[in-house]
């Protein structure tokens, strides 16, 4: 089993790096505002048609453009969901969503969280899935990538005040990166058996003679961008454990690769844009180290089995509860770590049925800000926040003003860094406390004791960090939970983006200082270790008390 796990992890990372490197080169061209080969003429026509100028924006203008797009998308999506019954492509005549559920779902997909307090096949029409959710899957992913583009330019430019044109960045990211790659993935999914149609649900008679209604729909197209954009919201309630979303071992591998593809490629793009590829590789190695350790822990925990099931006479010595037999323990464990290391939230197994330690690792990966590869764009700008914190700590130890890529890190940058890093922990801890203090919050818990608290902590961690996965034992479709999690999702997304853009605006105007003998090298093993230590330290200090009340207490209560 150990050899199989090692081969699975190694082959996954090898294929990922092979695919990510050329994509990183294309992303680096977009960061430099250089059109990809053969599209310059098309872009000129697009700019004229859409009324987009070549005028570059400062950080406030860039941020305002992103906020305007997302708030407009939020309003439109809410209306689509609320008045769904009056809109076309609704063969099952599904009614509109309640106000609190429509708000929760709209915020969820606009913020790239894709938390789902509903069952897709019994709640949403094809029009809502296509014109509402799928569109936001593209736009929310493009928003995250645009933010990290602006931050990277802040490090690579000097003595200017502009970070690029947000509208041009969004169009280029969507048309030349997200759409073509998603199209290729969707065609592969269709070939593997994922449905792509607008047919009404199909009644069938099973081999046992029972009547059943098979859901249909444009699944493959939404599934592709769901994974590529680290969105995670499933067309069906069972998400990627459903055979219509994830039918084979090949689609399972493709989905995991799609989740990490752009986050890994952005590391290569960062190195190329900075003029020092070692800088991007250092971040990639730090992410990969934490990722491999986390996968190993989850695999080990799930292979040990569940003592309660073993005592009840379970056939398998490994923990197969909540897992698909076509994937098994190892692939399910890898998928769980991939989807929570990134801000994806798609699942091919029920995380609520993992062992105490096996479920704690995905929860912790979300709580540290999903900086281990992370979401498209958000993972890299989240890790760069920890880089700034790491060089600040190193500067304190050696008595020098901290620098990164030749830019001095001053008080303003550190204040914004601290604010961005502290936003989500405050939401998680205060939100979990509020839920546990109120009857409306506690009534949603399926299980008592430590596992019930873990369900609450996981849900708020998932929402605040824009992941979207859940310990499904929590009945979260209530006005209290819909409003609480919508607030956490919105503030967790834009409460980080705003200080990140402020950091970019401050750094872009600074001059690049030449390296000296006292400059800390930020691409060697020493700095990689310091960066990993910083991530672990912040995660440990912030969440160990809460984790001790949930998964840790549950683990030590096992027979």
Swiss-Prot record:
Keywords: Cell inner membrane, Cell membrane, Ion transport, Membrane, Potassium, Potassium transport, Transmembrane, Transmembrane helix, Transport
Keyword match rRNA processing: no
Gene Ontology cellular component terms for the protein in this record: plasma membrane
UniProt-listed GO biological process terms: potassium ion transmembrane transport
Any Pfam family matching the protein: KdpA
Family classification: Belongs to the KdpA family.
Classification via HAMAP family: KdpA
Known partners and oligomeric status: The system is composed of three essential subunits: KdpA, KdpB and KdpC.
Protein name: Potassium-transporting ATPase potassium-binding subunit
Natural source organism: Salmonella typhimurium (strain LT2 / SGSC1412 / ATCC 700720)
Taxonomy of the source species: Bacteria, Pseudomonadati, Pseudomonadota, Gammaproteobacteria, Enterobacterales
């Amino acid at each position: 089993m150990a050899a199989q796990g090692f081969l699975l992890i190694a082959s996954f990372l090898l294929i990922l790096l092979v695919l990510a490197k050329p994509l990183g080169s294309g992303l680096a061209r977009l960061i430099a505002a250089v059109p990809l080969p053969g599209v310059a003429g098309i872009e000129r026509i697009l700019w004229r048609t859409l009324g987009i100028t070549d005028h570059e924006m400062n950080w406030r203008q860039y941020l305002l453009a992103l906020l305007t797009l997302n708030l407009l998308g939020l309003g439109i999506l809410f209306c689509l969901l609320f008045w769904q019954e009056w809109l076309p492509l609704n063969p099952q005549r599904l009614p509109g969503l309640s106000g609190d559920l429509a708000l929760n779902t709209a915020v969820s997909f606009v913020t790239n969280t894709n938390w789902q307090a509903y069952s897709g096949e019994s709640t949403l029409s094809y029009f809502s899935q296509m014109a509402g959710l799928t569109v936001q899957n593209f736009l929310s992913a493009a928003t995250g990538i645009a933010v990290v583009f602006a931050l990277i330019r802040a490090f690579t430019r000097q003595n200017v005040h502009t970070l690029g044109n947000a509208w041009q960045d969004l169009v280029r990211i969507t048309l030349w990166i997200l759409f073509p790659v998603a199209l290729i993935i969707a065609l592969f999914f269709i070939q593997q058996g994922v449905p792509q149609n607008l047919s009404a649900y199909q009644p069938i008679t099973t081999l046992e003679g029972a009547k059943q209604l098979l859901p249909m729909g444009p699944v493959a197209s939404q599934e592709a961008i769901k994974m590529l954009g680290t969105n995670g919201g499933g067309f069906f309630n069972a998400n990627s454990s459903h055979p219509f979303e994830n039918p084979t071992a090949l689609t399972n591998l493709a989905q995991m690769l799609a989740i990490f593809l752009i986050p890994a490629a952005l590391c290569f793009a960062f190195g190329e844009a900075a003029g020092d590829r070692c800088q991007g590789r250092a971040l990639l190695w730090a992410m990969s180290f934490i990722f491999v350790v986390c996968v190993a822990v989850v695999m080990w925990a799930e292979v040990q089995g569940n003592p309660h099931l073993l005592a009840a006479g379970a056939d398998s010595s490994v923990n197969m509860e909540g897992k698909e037999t076509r994937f098994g323990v190892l692939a399910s464990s890898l998928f769980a770590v991939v989807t929570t290391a990134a801000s994806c939230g798609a699942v091919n197994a029920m995380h609520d049925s993992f062992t105490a330690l096996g479920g704690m690792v995905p929860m912790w990966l979300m709580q540290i800000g999903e900086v281990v590869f992370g979401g498209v764009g958000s993972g890299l700008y989240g890790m760069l926040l920890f880089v700034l914190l790491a060089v600040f700590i190193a500067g304190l130890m050696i008595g020098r003003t901290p620098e990164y890529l030749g830019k001095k890190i001053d008080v303003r940058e550190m204040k914004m860094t601290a604010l961005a890093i502290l936003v989500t922990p405050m939401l998680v801890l205060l939100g979990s406390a509020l839920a546990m203090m109120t009857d409306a919050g506690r009534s949603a818990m399926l299980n008592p004791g430590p596992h019930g608290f873990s369900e609450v902590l996981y849900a708020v961690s998932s929402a605040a960090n824009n992941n979207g996965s859940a310990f499904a034992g929590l009945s979260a479709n209530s006005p209290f939970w819909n409003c609480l999690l919508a607030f956490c999702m919105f503030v967790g997304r834009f409460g980080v983006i705003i200080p990140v853009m402020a950091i970019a605006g401050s750094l872009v105007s600074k001059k690049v200082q030449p390296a000296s003998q006292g400059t800390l090298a930020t691409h060697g093993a020493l700095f990689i270790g310091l960066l990993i230590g910083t991530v672990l330290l912040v995660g440990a200090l912030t969440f160990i008390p809460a984790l001790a009340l949930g998964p840790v207490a549950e683990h030590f209560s096992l027979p």
